[in-house]
A protein has these predicted regions:
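An N-terminal assembly and electron-transfer interface module characteristic of large anaerobic redox
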Residues: 1-167
C-alpha cells in the first residue's frame, strides 16, 4: 500500500495485551493489590516507551480499551471475547476521530474472528462510510488489483474530502 502512495499505520500489538488485561479485570480474574501494582508498572513502561516512539513515527495515541469496545458495540458485543471486537473497534474509533481514511483487515484463510469482522465492516461502511479491505491470507501474495483498487478509492475519497474542506 505504501508503494501505491498510502501511509500505512499498523495496529499496535499492545492493544491486544491491554484488551486481554481489561477482560481479566472485567471477569474478576484480577483485582488484588499485586494486580494493581503490576498494571501500574506495565502502563508506566508502555507510556515511557510508546510516547517517544509515537512522536518519531507519527503514531496516534492508542485508544483506551473501553472506547474501542464502545466503538465496536453497535456491530459486535464484547461478550464475544477475542480479537473481533478489536478488529472492529480500533478502526471505527480511528475513523470517527479522522485518524484514518480506510482499514485493511488481514487474517489467516478462514479465520472465524476475521470473517466476523469482515462481515461487520460491510455494515460499518454502509452506516459510517469507513472503506475497508479484508485479506484472507493462505501464503500466497494478495492480488495486486485488490490493493490497487483500494488505494485508488482511498485517494479518491481523500481528494473529495479535501476539496470540500477548502471550498
Amino acid at each position: 500500500l505504501e508503494a501505491r502512495g498510502l501511509r500505512v499505520v499498523l495496529e499496535p500489538m499492545a492493544e491486544m495485551l491491554q484488551y486481554s488485561e481489561h477482560q481479566a479485570w472485567a471477569r474478576g480474574d484480577r483485582g488484588g493489590l499485586g494486580d494493581q501494582l503490576e498494571r501500574w508498572v506495565r502502563e508506566r513502561i508502555f507510556g515511557r516507551c510508546h510516547g517517544p516512539a509515537a512522536k518519531v513515527f507519527g503514531w496516534p495515541e492508542p485508544g483506551p480499551i473501553p472506547e474501542v469496545l464502545e466503538a465496536a458495540a453497535p456491530y459486535m458485543r464484547d461478550a464475544l471475547e477475542g480479537e473481533t471486537v478489536l478488529s472492529l473497534g480500533v478502526p471505527i474509533r480511528a475513523w470517527r476521530r479522522g485518524e484514518i481514511d480506510g482499514a485493511v483487515l488481514v487474517g489467516p484463510l478462514e479465520c472465524m474472528p476475521n470473517k466476523l469482522a469482515e462481515a461487520q465492516l460491510t455494515h460499518v461502511a454502509e452506516r459510517e462510510g469507513l472503506l475497508s479491505l479484508a485479506l484472507s491470507l493462505n501464503g500466497e501474495p494478495p492480488d495486486p488489483e485488490l490493493l490497487d483498487n483500494f488505494a485508488f478509492e482511498v485517494k479518491r475519497r481523500w481528494a473529495r474530502r479535501r476539496a470540500a474542506a477548502t471550498a
